Amino acid sequence: MSAVTESVLESIISPVTMSEFLEEYWPVKPLVARGEVERFTSIPGFEKVRTLENVLAIYNNPVMVVGDAVIEESEGITDRFLVSPAEALEWYEKGAALEFDFTDLFIPQVRRWIEKLKAELRLPAGTSSKAIVYAAKNGGGFKAHFDAYTNLIFQIQGEKTWKLAKNENVSNPMQHYDLSEAPYYPDDLQSYWKGDPPKEDLPDAEIVNLTPGTMLYLPRGLWHSTKSDQATLALNITFGQPAWLDLMLAALRKKLISDNRFRELAVNHQSLHESSKSELNGYLESLIQTLSENAETLTPEQIFQSQDSDFDPYQSTQLVFRQLLTSYKF
């Protein structure tokens, strides 16, 4: 495999090279790269997230506050909600963790770097990506869960303790899951879930202490939790993880959408009389046959041509929501 041109990420994970990272770690094995925090200055726009004050000065969007302080305020209804940037510092002092989602909206240099990094990581062009800044104080953190995204975490201030545990229940998950939800599992996740979940404190986890200047590559699906008893600040670069299923479905949709029958309005099968149900079943069988024929003629080239599709409508919607809110003053 040909080597990848040296990059900002490569300079941070050194002595691991970008080629070694792609071959030995990406996309399933975590990597901890330690060094001085000054090396993060190679990240474009880093000076705008160097301190919590820097972040609050540029972030013109609602801030997610998370943790026990929120649970207490809401009388147990929720552990998180959105507040204005003006209120965020007050919640921070109460012990809530702050999440500045889509921080890259306010730092064009970071946005451009993320797009370049997406290409270096060989991700499809339509992959969702963003920067998130996390700030926590007085024991703030997140309980055990796994993500459907992958993260590059750059610890800027303070020390944060991470628990990392191999996921024996699912591989390549396509949705986020909080361990506190067990034994409830969403239908899609249930279809490929195996065994019993781990205990909530992840007793068999590896303990990783992130100190200023440490970078953690966190693959999707890895069980993890975080905790800090001091003020911490970290920059997360988050990438979606489009599966071959996503690309194939997008390519198949492009083939089928030209057929008017597939664009017809669907009906509620339960609302029909038996004779109509039988007639509809026959009609759907003909559509299934057409679908099968199109799937059989699907080519790798057609699949590759779908790489710029929108694989994450939720994140796309969130981005539009955040963009609209940037015009408001708090």
Swiss-Prot record:
Keywords: Iron, Metal-binding. It comes from Bacillus subtilis (strain 168). This is Uncharacterized protein YxbC. SUPFAM superfamilies: Clavaminate synthase-like. Fe cation binds at residues 145, 147, 224. InterPro entries: JmjC_dom (IPR003347), NO66-like (IPR039994). Belongs to the ROX family. Binds 1 Fe(2+) ion per subunit. Its cofactor is Fe(2+). It comes from the Bacteria. The lineage of its organism: Bacteria, Bacillati, Bacillota, Bacilli, Bacillales. One of its GO terms (molecular function) is metal ion binding. The gene is yxbC. Residues 96-256 form the JmjC domain.
